[in-house]
């Protein structure tokens, strides 16, 4: 777990910088920077944006079974663009232009157990991906999709995981100024950032093969 987190932080360090400020005579950067003036369009902006270097979909929530047993969960899908400013034309299905990370945790409050799982895959051979024309993100058989206003998370590993339907019950919140969350003083060192702060959640939590029907609330 620690090695994977270090790897992810290293990739963020290498590729999260603003895609601007190129020296004269160099090609224009491939990736856009998060700049003021962006006009959000939904549901399009719930989908993937491959012209930005880093993107993630993050969920966390508190759940309770029909018998009152409590659980917590966290689910995150990451996309990191790797081609850089001068992509190489490579027709191979094995080429790596994006790497996809996924983290899932389940907290079993009653038994004081914390379950953590992660995946790292490439896009080229469809082991993972994030669509730009519809709400579909996946990493192997873990997935995040939508049916109308309801989002669905499916993720299991070693018979432990979640299958949840999440429906917003509060309006979308934009962080920072007009959805621009500033990360530093340099121009473009920011992210487009919005959330659903309360989502009705129902479905199943799986603990080593045991299925618990649950309800609760989540934050995206």
Protein language model annotation of sequence segments:
Residues 1-4:
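Positively charged n-region of N-terminal signal peptides that target proteins for export
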Residues 6-15:
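Bacterial N-terminal signal peptides
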């Amino acid at each position: 777990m620690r090695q994977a987190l270090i790897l992810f932080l290293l990739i963020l360090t290498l590729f999260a910088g603003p895609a601007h400020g190129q020296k004269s005579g160099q090609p224009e950067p491939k990736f856009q920077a998060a700049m003021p003036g962006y006009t959000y369009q939904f549901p399009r902006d719930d989908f993937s944006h491959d012209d930005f270097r880093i993107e993630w979909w993050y969920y966390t929530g508190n759940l309770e079974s029909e018998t009152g047993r409590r659980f917590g969960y966290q689910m995150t899908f990451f996309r990191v663009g790797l081609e850089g400013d001068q992509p190489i034309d490579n027709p191979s299905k094995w080429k790596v232009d994006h790497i996809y990370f996924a983290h899932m945790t389940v907290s079993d409050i009653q038994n004081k157990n914390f379950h953590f799982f992660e995946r790292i895959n490439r896009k080229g051979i469809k082991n993972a991906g994030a669509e730009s024309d519809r709400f579909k993100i996946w990493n192997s058989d873990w997935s995040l999709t939508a049916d109308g206003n309801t989002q669905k998370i499916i993720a299991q590993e070693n018979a432990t995981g979640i299958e949840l339907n999440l429906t917003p019950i509060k309006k979308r919140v934009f962080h920072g100024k007009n959805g621009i969350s500033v990360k530093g003083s340099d121009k473009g060192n920011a992210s487009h950032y919005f959330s659903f702060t309360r989502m009705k959640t129902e479905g199943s939590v799986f603990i080593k093969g045991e299925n618990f029907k649950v309800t609760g609330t989540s934050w995206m």
